[in-house]
């Protein structure tokens, strides 16, 4: 894992060398690692202008499940995205933050977004009939024209791709499974798939600590830290 991470950082340094020398110097000095006391499958390093979140594969020791670049919206973030794109680095999924439009596949993570006061970012859900959050059920009954309306995107194992496309989400929150073979049509939408592997943590505190990652995604980092602590 350390070798993979080191190689990844070398790639990123190369990307910024070709686009912005001052940014490269910042990168070369390294970033600030977010402290995780209990989570074992998540590492986040903050750099100037973006953060890198690395999810280790809970089923394959030493392998990486997914790597995300969390890039703030705005002009500075636009330049960071250009640097990533010019490097043709297909191993990194860029997520513009804060996410304000998302499709959430699990009731657990819907509840977490409510705890983080980020429920307005829930625009679509899967398995609506199993979501025990009264407000989500009420929002699903609202007229489609209502800004608070939540769309039922069908079964999480075979979601309605057309409905998801219509929502224009900035991210889709999915649960990874061992040997799943990917996410079918969702993989082809060019919409960031956030693989919520928190349930594979061995301890309840480890699972809960992932809220720091979700807080960063939805612009609720301080709320997540406060909630966890």
Q: Where in this protein do the model-derived segments appear?
A:
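Bacterial Sec-dependent N-terminal signal peptides
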Residues: 1-24
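N-terminal ligand-binding lobe of clamshell/alpha-beta domains
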Residues: 19-229
């Amino acid at each position: 894992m350390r070798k993979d991470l080191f190689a990844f950082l070398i790639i990123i340094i190369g990307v910024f060398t070709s686009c912005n020398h001052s940014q490269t110097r910042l990168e070369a000095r390294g970033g600030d690692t977010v402290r995780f006391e209990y989570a074992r499958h998540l590492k986040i390093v903050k750099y100037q202008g973006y953060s890198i979140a690395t999810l280790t594969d809970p089923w394959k020791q030493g392998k990486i499940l997914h790597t995300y670049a969390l890039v703030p919206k705005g002009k500075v973030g636009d330049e960071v995205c250009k640097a990533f794109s010019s490097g043709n680095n297909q191993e990194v999924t860029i997520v513009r933050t804060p996410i304000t439009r998302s499709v959430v596949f699990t009731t657990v993570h819907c509840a977490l977004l409510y705890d983080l006061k980020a429920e307005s970012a829930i625009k679509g859900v899967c398995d609506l009939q199993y979501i025990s959050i009264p407000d989500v059920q009420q929002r699903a009954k609202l007229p489609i024209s209502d800004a608070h309306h939540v769309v039922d995107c069908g079964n999480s194992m075979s979601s309605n791709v057309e409905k998801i496309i219509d929502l224009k989400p900035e991210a889709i929150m999915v649960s990874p499974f061992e040997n799943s073979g990917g996410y079918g049509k969702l993989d082809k939408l060019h919409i960031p798939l956030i693989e919520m592997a928190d349930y594979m943590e061995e301890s309840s505190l480890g699972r809960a600590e992932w809220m720091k990652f979700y807080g960063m995604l939805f612009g609720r980092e301080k709320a997540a830290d406060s909630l966890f602590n």
